[in-house]
UniProtKB/Swiss-Prot annotation:
Part of the 50S ribosomal subunit. Contacts protein L29, and trigger factor when it is bound to the ribosome. This is Large ribosomal subunit protein uL23. InterPro entries: Nucleotide-bd_a/b_plait_sf (IPR012677), Ribosomal_uL23-like (IPR013025), Ribosomal_uL23/eL15/eS24_sf (IPR012678). One of its GO terms (biological process) is translation.
Amino acid sequence: MEARDILKRPVITEKSSEAMAEDKYTFDVDTRVNKTQVKMAVEEIFNVKVASVNIMNYKPKKKRMGRYQGYTNKRRKAIVTLKEGSIDLFN
């Protein structure tokens, strides 16, 4: 799996924006990847040094549309902490 396939999109919320001040960046990632693969992908794409990676899994939620019922997609979110002295990702 290539680095561009691992990171789907950055997560831009109020909480993740506040965490950027502490050099913590949040991404939606592929559900099949592990912390090491996320670390290598961020270092390759953005040319920064990663200190740590925390991953959260979100289960699919049950949703109804009239009489039909289904599930939302499951998600996996990674919070990447950069080492001191690294460049900002989004500047």
